[in-house]
From Swiss-Prot:
<protein>
    <recommendedName>
        <fullName>GTP cyclohydrolase 1 type 2 homolog</fullName>
    </recommendedName>
</protein>
<comment type="subunit">
    <text>Homohexamer.</text>
</comment>
<feature type="binding site">
    <location>
        <position position="219"/>
    </location>
    <ligand>
        <name>a divalent metal cation 2</name>
    </ligand>
</feature>
<feature type="binding site">
    <location>
        <position position="101"/>
    </location>
    <ligand>
        <name>a divalent metal cation 1</name>
    </ligand>
</feature>
<feature type="binding site">
    <location>
        <position position="215"/>
    </location>
    <ligand>
        <name>a divalent metal cation 2</name>
    </ligand>
</feature>
<comment type="similarity">
    <text>Belongs to the GTP cyclohydrolase I type 2/NIF3 family.</text>
</comment>
<dbReference type="InterPro" id="IPR036069">
    <property type="entry name" value="DUF34/NIF3_sf"/>
</dbReference>
<feature type="binding site">
    <location>
        <position position="219"/>
    </location>
    <ligand>
        <name>a divalent metal cation 1</name>
    </ligand>
</feature>
<feature type="binding site">
    <location>
        <position position="64"/>
    </location>
    <ligand>
        <name>a divalent metal cation 2</name>
    </ligand>
</feature>
<dbReference type="InterPro" id="IPR002678">
    <property type="entry name" value="DUF34/NIF3"/>
</dbReference>
<keyword id="KW-0479">Metal-binding</keyword>
<dbReference type="GO" id="GO:0005737">
    <property type="term" value="C:cytoplasm"/>
</dbReference>
<dbReference type="Pfam" id="PF01784">
    <property type="entry name" value="DUF34_NIF3"/>
</dbReference>
<dbReference type="GO" id="GO:0046872">
    <property type="term" value="F:metal ion binding"/>
</dbReference>
<feature type="binding site">
    <location>
        <position position="63"/>
    </location>
    <ligand>
        <name>a divalent metal cation 1</name>
    </ligand>
</feature>
């Protein structure tokens, strides 16, 4: 497949042109024109790049790319090494960030809802869906379910709450700031990737169950879903590689 054609296909599938993002979505570094083998992962870290090189990959697709609005516009240190490795091996680097968070089927949030069997009822923000469990469950049972499904013991806070979990809002990745919008929707639980100090106070004072399942763990299933879609739809030689991250 042509490298620019692959970019167009995924841009169309994820409706990338609809969003203003903090990164350039699509092809971030141009490599060889013809792509036969692709490696995918959550983040364009050196470990993933090295594995792509050792696997003779022509392309890398990630959720977290190399270029961000808030990053210095200077290429040095680890970023120089990453970019040099990609260019020296004529590899195409693609990244889809927000579009892969919010896609209604392949997106990270959609995947979380599907995995936890949450019936989506609406959206508090475009990246913050809310929904209902079929039956209320205890917080310890939700923790066990998350551990089983995401292979990660979640951080949980809800020491002052006696009611069970039923109505949940969630946001993949670094979504803890969105807890501020939760109370007015009558949600009893908020789940996201990361946690901040002030998150605990807000959850406590609003009597909310709070779960942090890990940034990486909350965003692993979107890129896996995109990988599977490309493999089935276009018969590509494409494989996901998990570079585990405890955060």
């Amino acid at each position: 497949m042509n490298n620019f054609e692959l970019e167009k296909i995924v841009n169309k599938k994820l409706n990338s042109n609809q969003y203003n993002d903090v990164i350039p979505n699509g092809l971030q570094i141009e490599g060889r024109p013809k792509i036969k083998k692709i490696v995918t992962g959550v983040t364009a870290c050196q470990l993933l790049i090295d594995l792509a090189i050792s696997n003779n990959a022509h392309g890398i697709i990630v959720h977290h790319g190399l270029f961000w609005d808030n990053h210095p516009k200077i290429i040095k240190g680890i970023y120089r090494h990453r970019i040099k490795s990609i260019l020296a091996n004529n590899i195409n680097l693609y990244s889809w960030h927000f579009p892969l968070d919010v896609h209604p089927i392949l997106g990270n949030n959609a995947q979380i809802g599907h995995i936890l069997n949450i019936n989506v009822r609406g959206y508090i923000k475009s990246c913050v869906p809310w929904g209902m469990l079929k039956e209320p469950i205890k917080s310890k049972d939700m923790s066990q379910l998350i551990t089983q499904k995401f292979h990660r013991v979640p951080f949980y806070y809800g020491n002052n709450i006696t009611q069970n979990i039923h109505k949940i809002a969630w946001c993949s990745g670094k979504g803890q700031k969105f807890i501020n919008f939760i109370p007015e929707y009558g949600v009893d639980t908020f789940l996201t990737g990361e946690v901040s100090e002030e998150t605990i106070h807000f959850a406590h004072e609003n009597k909310l169950h709070f779960f942090s399942i890990g940034h990486h763990a909350s965003e692993i299933n979107g890129i896996k879903a995109l990988t599977n879609w490309l493999k089935i739809k276009f018969s590509l030689d494409i494989n996901f590689i998990n570079i585990d991250n405890p955060i």
